[in-house]
Amino acid sequence: ESMLHENAYTETRQMTEAFNKMLGRLRVLDDSRTEFVSNVSHELKTPLTSMKVLSDSLLTQEDVPVELYKEFMGDLSEEIERENKIINDLLSLVKMDKTADTMNISSVNINTLVERILKQLRPIAAKNNIEVVFESFRPVTAEVDEVKLSLAITNLVENAIKYNQENGWVHVALNADHKLFYIEVADSGIGIAPEETDHIFERFYRVDKSHSREIGGTGLGLAIARSAIVMHRGAIKVYSQPGKGTTFTVKIPLTYVS
């Protein structure tokens, strides 16, 4: 009988522990969801506040000079663009969460895909005299969801351009073996401190809070990139040192396994 009691006690204790663990996990999930919503609200409100201030100051002034009017309109346009980027990033992320089960897999030429992305981003890099170089070691064709993978690579290269230094460089390399293909995005940028690297894939996490406004972006890019890569059963790693640039390495199976 004492044996039965002991078993029942052990089972009850195990159930209690399991339940507490589950509660803990739900609490963490709930906290991160609450934080996510408050971050979203903050991100969306910031450009709106700027727009309100700009338009109010135009409305309250008599006979505004044309130059000032144009300058304010330019600023307004920038804020609208910023708001648009935030909304697009959020939609991408929500879509990722929603379509985690639906992968539109097709056979894609990865070389062409990367070249197309770099062609789109080179004009942005050119503004700060940043050279974007693509090194392909072999032709690579893989089974991927083209839209999701494009989003991941675009975000990685965009970040490399954004957090770079004037007259810097971004080096993108593509390689493959018989099982996986590898994409490396290296830059000569500001780098990331060791204690920050664990957090950079979190939604809304920004390494450089002080410059986040002038650099722009939402802090969602890397979360989106990682989501897309994980959906391909791939992995992403980061190597970085402050002031010495950052390298992201991505590996993804050539053949998609659902």
Task: Pin down the residues of each PLM region.
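Short alpha-helical segment of the dimerization/phosphotransfer core of two-component systems
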Residues: 78-86
